[in-house]
Amino acid sequence: LKIDLPTVPEWPLEQKLQGERDTLGHYLSGHPTDPWKDELAQLSTCPLGEIADRYQPPKPRKNDDGDNNRFRRGPDTPWTVAGMVTAVRKRGDSDAFVRLEDGSGIIEVSFFGELYQQIAPLLTRDQMLIVDGGLRIDDFSGGGFQLRARSAMSLADACRKHARLLQLKLNGIGPDFVGQLQHALAGYRGGRASVTLHGYRNRNAQADLELGEAWRVDAIPDLLRSVRALPGVQAARLRI
């Protein structure tokens, strides 16, 4: 008995990880933030797993050591974290506590009042968030860290706002590559990020190219997914 099985392309990492979680309840091949590791690192103070090494507690304010102040929230340190929402715990209609992960660590982020009302639609499982706020040691969690949010945006909005360059590293492109690239970029034109091609070659020469201003793009995750899937694109990265 011979069975001929069709040859199909390998699943993208995100699709593979989703299947692993749905089937097994956990990830085997990596973490969902892995495709965005470079972007998350550029948009945050440091990876979550490095906070303990990088954090320097602020100097206490005058009289903060007094017994009458032991329940007062101490000073915090300005910090930016980035990661994927893995759990949301709401308290009433005005507060939420969100767990972010990035494959290297975990942190709880608190959202209160008006900010919570503004960004509540983003506080959903699997959402990639960039959060600015005040970092402090959480004495109630055994010495972990907590961030009190002051502003937040999705990874897509952060990339759209801050990305200045989309770099494509090429390897072995075919004759249809230019048309395929134009098609992939077409729906994202009109943004602020330049596009560069590293290792572009034809029968006559090899060069690094920067596309003209007419091809500046909104360098959001959906675009990165599209260009990474093109034959001949070895890597696609944003510079922020």
Segments the model singles out, each with a brief description of its role:
Residues L1-I240:
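Noncatalytic, beta-rich nucleic-acid-contacting surfaces in large DNA/RNA-processing enzymes
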